[in-house]
């Protein structure tokens, strides 16, 4: 099962692109689940170390819904809008709060496969920096990061929204990078299942 996580507090561009990625994966035979931060209460990590002692997060909010989804996930597709040249505060909170999962089980994420999507209002608005933040999260936690590879989707799927849903839908280069990244992500998942 693959969990798609939308890190946008708004409904349009990032959610749309993530939905398209999940459809592509479903067409390849994968089961997917969708999680959005929109409308959810996900507080930032307090780094209080409660999770180190008690093996769970002390902050009881909507993050527990995602914790449950991630338990069965073989793959993670994390999508973020670009805010100030990086990830959204909401997806950063999600990544930081996953500390509790690793505190409870150091190998929680080990062997899962991850890809990243970033949607920016400008063509060169920080998409690659946002993706690097997500890939760093993956690496630190034992998730196998997958990119689209050389020649056009180097570290993940990048979109230029022009701050509209219509802009995303018209971004042919963005969809090319998405198709390449989804293809390599699916191939890695298939290889991992065959191991």
Curated annotation (Swiss-Prot):
**Residue ranges of coiled coil:** none
Pfam families registered for this protein in UniProt: FMN_red
Give the cofactor binding note. Binds 1 FMN per subunit.
Q: List the disulfide bonds.
A: none
Tell me which UniProt keywords the record has, alphabetically.
4Fe-4S, Flavoprotein, FMN, Iron, Iron-sulfur, Metal-binding
Q: Name one GO molecular function term.
A: 4 iron, 4 sulfur cluster binding
Instruction: Please tell me where [4Fe-4S] cluster binds in this chain.
Output: 45, 48, 51, 57
Cofactor(s) the protein needs? FMN; [4Fe-4S] cluster
- PANTHER family (UniProt xref): IRON-SULFUR FLAVOPROTEIN MJ0731, NAD(P)H-DEPENDENT FMN-CONTAINING OXIDOREDUCTASE YWQN-RELATED
How it assembles, according to the record, is:
Homodimer.
Q: What is the protein's known function?
A: Redox-active protein probably involved in electron transport.
Family per UniProt? Belongs to the SsuE family. Isf subfamily.
Return the protein name.
Answer: Iron-sulfur flavoprotein AF_1519
Q: Which organism is it from?
A: Archaeoglobus fulgidus (strain ATCC 49558 / DSM 4304 / JCM 9628 / NBRC 100126 / VC-16)
